[in-house]
Amino acid sequence: MAAKRPAAGEGGGKAAAGAAAAKKRVALVNITNVAAAANNAKFNSATWAAPVKKGSLASGRNVCTNRVSAVKSASAKPAPAISRHESAPQKESVIPPKVLSIVPTAAPAPVTVPCSSFVSPMHSGDSVSVDETMSMCDSMKSPDFEYIDNGDSSSVLGSLQRRANENLRISEDRDVEETKWNKDAPSPMEIDQICDVDNNYEDPQLCATLASDIYMHLREAETRKRPSTDFMETIQKDVNPSMRAILIDWLVEVAEEYRLVPDTLYLTVNYIDRYLSGNEINRQRLQLLGVACMLIAAKYEEICAPQVEEFCYITDNTYFRDEVLEMEASVLNYLKFEVTAPTAKCFLRRFVRVAQVSDEDPALHLEFLANYVAELSLLEYNLLSYPPSLVAASAIFLAKFILQPTKHPWNSTLAHYTQYKSSELSDCVKALHRLFSVGPGSNLPAIREKYTQHKKFVAKKHCPPSVPSEFFRDATC
């Protein structure tokens, strides 16, 4: 199994090719020579792949352009003669960010200030006489205040100060240091007001009237369409979690090259795990399974899905067209054509919108950082024990914590719409925090490189070494 991925600037000359050769990315090849290891053993990606040149981010990373000409070349000539980049224009392999609309919260009520009883002494045709003004002031007097029209202003201020001290009963002995805010200490979760997120009835895409019912349906559906959490130990004999992670890392690059939407990637991983939960497979056919699952997901999500020949090409024609179609039929039959499955991306889109309603963090930083954390979770086999909605909520929690380490990441609005308390997110947040801090590994660079690009640039965010335990305590009334 191999995926040749020439550099985007290969047709530009030998100088560009030499510069691209300095940075190499290995893709998948036949891994029959890899000895079976423990489930958590680390595999060097060099045993999976042949070296492939890789261009810089500025010129577009490993872009597969001009699909039609590539497919014709793949079908008319043998694999070694295929060249898809000799005359193809370059394009940037970055999925455009999807900026969510932010529904502004209700503005605070204006503060009413009592009108002054003084009238401007300027003479004009519309001015009010002093007698009329005095009569109006007399009729508007309140029994709680003493109005002095011509008296000394100092006596008025003294009277008001005495009344304020009596009513408020301000103690001069109060310790001010106890109320002093400490910037270094994490703030506890407070009982705040729940913001209305579903109040925009003009945009039909937001489905304001049905949003709550849709969320409840997705929460119910995720329990029925989840993969097994122990299929590596009970079903698979020749495949381990490290091989699964390398396959998903390669699929991330394929999705980037063909500019597939993020939902396609999440669905692909869901199909792979569900199929592996009930079918034993050897390592020679693992990449074939990944390609077939991405083909199914692309047909479901994409407007213009890549053709079968393009997926054959991306594997360096390791598999024939009939083999891909045969595996596609096998996956669909096992899934009983139930290809609609809630993923972490489905919930994350909703949770990001909820978090942005009353959040002070930059909207794009929060969105990109939460998406980066959620995509990292795809590589980790052990995180299959958490439902997608919990992973999405934990990604929001961790992203908000990274952006503002001293502020409580959770609030009443997020707890209401996600239906998760901060204490329920503790284990998953800690697992994601370790994954974010340590990283997926040098042999799994695709996701980190994707979110290091200048349009996102959140993969190198500084993360505190630990999450304070106070943040996982539920708020009490």
From Swiss-Prot:
Gene3D superfamilies per UniProt: Cyclin-like
UniProt keyword annotation of Cell cycle present: yes
Alphabetical UniProt keywords: Cell cycle, Cell division, Cyclin
The keyword Magnesium is annotated on this UniProt entry: no
A GO cellular-component term linked to this record: nucleus
Biological processes per GO annotation: cell division; G1/S transition of mitotic cell cycle
Superkingdom to which the source organism belongs: Eukaryota
GO molecular function list: cyclin-dependent protein serine/threonine kinase regulator activity
Family indicated by similarity: Belongs to the cyclin family. Cyclin AB subfamily.
Designated name of the protein: Cyclin-A1-2
Organism: Oryza sativa subsp. japonica (Rice)
